[in-house]
From Swiss-Prot:
Record Pfam families: RNase_T (PF00929)
Subunit structure: Homodimer.
Name of the protein described by the UniProt record: Ribonuclease T
Claim: Chaperone is one of the keywords in the record: no
HAMAP family: RNase_T
Family: Belongs to the RNase T family.
Gene Ontology molecular functions: 3'-5' exonuclease activity; magnesium ion binding; nucleic acid binding; RNA exonuclease activity, producing 5'-phosphomonoesters
Amino acids binding Mg(2+) 1: D36
Ranges for region Disordered: 1-21
Keyword set, alphabetical order: Exonuclease, Hydrolase, Magnesium, Metal-binding, Nuclease, tRNA processing
Amino acid sequence: MSEDHFDDEHEGHGGGGGSRHPMAARFRGYLPVVVDVETGGFNSATDALLEIAAVTIGMDEKGFVFPEHTYFFRVEPFEGANIEAAALEFTGIKLDHPLRMAVSEETAMNDIFRGVRKALKANGCKRAVLVGHNASFDLGFVNAAVARMDMKRNPFHPFSSFDTATLAGLAYGQTVLAKACQAAGIDFDGREAHSARYDTEKTAELFCGIVNRWKEMGGWQDFDD
């Protein structure tokens, strides 16, 4: 199925594709929302979702984008979920930590989706497009959680995404998040990495920096057309 066909079939979703809000004009009716997940492995169908964060993107009166609102949840593994010891060692997540205060997948996804739908309405956009560093990984886990809970109101496009690994490779010659941020002049603390919240906020800064740099170079000017 092509993206255009999907859009035609789902035109009623979101905040109204006909709006001329500058954000809707800039991204063809889509609202970029940065997402990062920390998981119990690489398989979205079998491995646990342990953390998820999302950052909505705003736009100022001059057409420059910026990170707006952050949503973050530690997530209880779904029943029967696989969790690889190597994944916990890599992320540093301690499932039995008394301050972890995890919530169910349903609570996390519903709260994030509620915030995304609010941002869609505010920006006159019809649907969110996931932005991620190696975005297919994050989108796969979002889609798997949606399928597990049979959620009917997923604001995200099911297969389109913006990948900051690709964008950073083009803009800065770097595809690793930490190195791409450093090349972009964004502070990055490796001790904070592999927290969904930290990685999402840094990915949002990187995405906005690339989009704004492109605009400054003349690549996007008349966002009212």
